[in-house]
């Protein structure tokens, strides 16, 4: 089992024990052929971690309250998008006539987590030997690195909730241990500062 799937399973197990209602928002995954058929019109390839994530969970509709909103951040860019929604909004990222057109070092971005205005994206056509970074796109079209890659994002989440570095029940970080969270974040994203957009 990969570190990505293992960390996702850790999150699910923790939620089933501590917040069973939240765990119910985790949808079943798609098969590889279902994923491929939903994104077949994409003009670029996506990294292996993308397929692994969607085989674990198919995501949720935009209006569904999910675990991701409470685990990762106080912002709205943390709900795992269904592929239907991601495919609906991604053309805005690549259409140069759109105000929200954006890319990462000349490569396309695909919105895997998000809301109607802010997104966490994976990089398309990523050919580096390392996994794709996760890039945050704000509603004012600024980009910055959120996580070194998708695995580091989930490792950060799993360890943070298990160590009680974040209070899962809050909508903001009023009840979080900033020092402990930062320690966990930089443990799994130690070279984040080396990356630049």
Question: Language-model segments: which ranges?
Answer:
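A surface-exposed partner-binding patch
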Residues: 1-117, 186-197
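Short, flexible helical or helix-coil boundary motifs
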Residues: 15-18, 22, 157, 161, ...
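Short acidic/polar capping segments at secondary-structure boundaries
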Residues: 116-118, 140-143
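Short strand-connecting beta-turns/loops that link adjacent beta-strands
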Residues: 117, 128-129
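Short, surface-exposed beta-strand/loop micro-motifs that present aromatic residues
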Residues: 120-126
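Intrinsically disordered, low-complexity regulatory segments enriched in Ser/Thr/Pro
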Residues: 130-138
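Compact, glycine/acidic-enriched structural inserts
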Residues: 136, 143-163
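Acidic, proline/glycine-rich low-complexity IDRs
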Residues: 165-197
């Amino acid at each position: 089992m990969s570190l990505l799937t293992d960390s996702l399973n850790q999150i699910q197990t923790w939620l089933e024990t501590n917040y069973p209602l939240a765990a119910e928002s985790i949808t079943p995954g798609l098969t590889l052929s279902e994923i491929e058929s939903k994104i077949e019109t994409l003009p670029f390839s996506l990294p292996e971690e993308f397929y692994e994530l969607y085989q674990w969970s198919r995501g949720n509709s935009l209006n569904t309250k999910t675990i991701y909103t409470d685990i990762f951040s106080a912002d709205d860019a943390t709900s795992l998008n269904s592929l239907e929604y991601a495919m609906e909004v991604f053309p805005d990222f690549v259409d140069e006539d759109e105000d929200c057109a954006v890319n990462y070092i000349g490569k396309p971005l695909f919105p895997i987590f998000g809301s109607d205005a802010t997104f966490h994206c994976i990089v398309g056509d990523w050919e580096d030997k390392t996994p794709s970074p996760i890039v945050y796109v704000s509603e004012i079209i600024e980009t910055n690195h959120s996580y070194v890659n998708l695995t580091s994002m989930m490792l950060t989440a799993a360890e943070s909730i298990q160590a009680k570095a974040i209070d899962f029940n809050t909508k903001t970080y009023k009840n979080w241990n900033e020092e402990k969270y930062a320690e966990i974040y930089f443990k799994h994203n130690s070279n984040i500062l080396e990356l630049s957009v």
